[in-house]
Amino acid sequence: MMKLTRRELLTAGLPALAATVLPPNTALAAAMPPAVSPLATGKAWPARRKQIERAWLDLLGDFPTEIPPLKPSMKQASHAGGITRYHVSFQAEPDDRVTAWLLVPDSAKRKRAPAIINIHSTTWGAGKDSTAGLAGRRPQDPPTAPEIGRASGLELARHGYVTLCIDLLTDGERIKPGERVMDTRGFYRKHPEWSIVGKNIWDVMRSVDFLQTLDFVESKQIGVIGWSLGGHLALFAGAFDPRIAATISNGGVLDWHRKVDAWSRKPDDWKPWVQGDPERSNPELERRFGFKTNSGPYIYIKKFRPYIEDQAKRIPTDFDELMMLVAPRPLLIISSEWEFYSHKIIPKCLEAAKVYAGWRDVEGLPSVMAARQQRAGYDKTLAYYEFNNKLTPDRIAAQISEIGAGDAFSWFSFPGGHAYPPVARQMTFAWYDRWLGHVPSLT
């Protein structure tokens, strides 16, 4: 069987990205080319985008070049409330499988539905069970209260979306024997030049591969969402997999903190945990959650450590540019008011919004306007403005194209703490319904 590289798979038949180039991020002023006129859209943005992507991959590590067969497993676990729950797994690497709950509303069995990859937050062993509404932070804990919103995968399925709730490596079923939850030491012994963030992105890519094999899924209408750790990863996944049609990052850390415990912890040693070792826990987490976390050292991006050790060292990229990599596909940033302040989200969103608002179609490149015309509901736009304004379809398209992709990017804050409250979940449903062309239906 012919083997394709990840890049070959992702770029085959997919739209090339073309947008106006922005003034360079001040941190990259010395490295990036000068800004150009929006009229030069198609000529300059692809090169700029490659520079941003390369800067991130230099930190994250490159993705594997060969893709193993999926070898999926799918077994029904339950059917209740109009939703069938399947336990699924599929190959991520030759010696590693992603485990997940697949939630399928009855309506999807009669008509193909969009699908959402739902990524859990930091848990202490519950992993995918938390987003599927089966457990709290730990496997033995009951599901959290609805107002907290941890079971967002179940809610999306109740809204009519096929939902894939995955386990991230080091959590849920993917805690290796002899290791603690959130212990990445084994991963870095195996992949010293990669990062757990890069690995998690890869696993989401493989999740897209899996969903596209299902005959009840609209294969071009796949979204990704997560909260907290999952929200952080959702933005990365949307940036690096152009098959993801709409992204929501909720409560994810979107700012660099040059602290040892934030991005690149250095463990006391690289030996695996063995039975009888003293517990690793955090008094502050014990105070907040009421139990010993007993977690391992979670090292997000190993190659970020030089920027912690040398506070004056220039960080080569930032999260506004990660948002730009998602463009022109729809992206929604959700966080609490405090997180908008502490992560400096507004300035980053304003920079990314320039890419979206300045997006223009260029002859010879795939059209953003064509994507609008292919989404459900565009026929209603034509019918309304042809009848009320006597406009031709070409004129309607010409006028709408002037907004670029500006309406495909937005941000939303809510009061309170680090959570996923009902108002944020309502925004989630509205965003996906709009951009994935979904009419809610469970049965």
Walk through the language-model features, giving the residues of each.
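Mobile cap/lid helix-loop segments that gate and shape the active-site cleft of serine hydrolases
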Residues: 190-191, 249-322, 341-351, 355-379, ...
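C-terminal catalytic histidine-bearing segment of alpha/beta-hydrolase fold enzymes
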Residues: 362-365, 369-443
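N-terminal cap/lid segment of alpha/beta-hydrolase-fold proteins
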Residues: 69-108
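N-terminal secretory signal peptides and thylakoid transit peptides that target proteins
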Residues: 2-16
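Primarily recognizes the serine-hydrolase "nucleophile elbow" in alpha/beta-hydrolase
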Residues: 209-269
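C-terminal segment of N-terminal export signals and the immediately downstream linker at the start
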Residues: 23-43
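Short beta-strand element of the alpha/beta-hydrolase
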Residues: 111-121
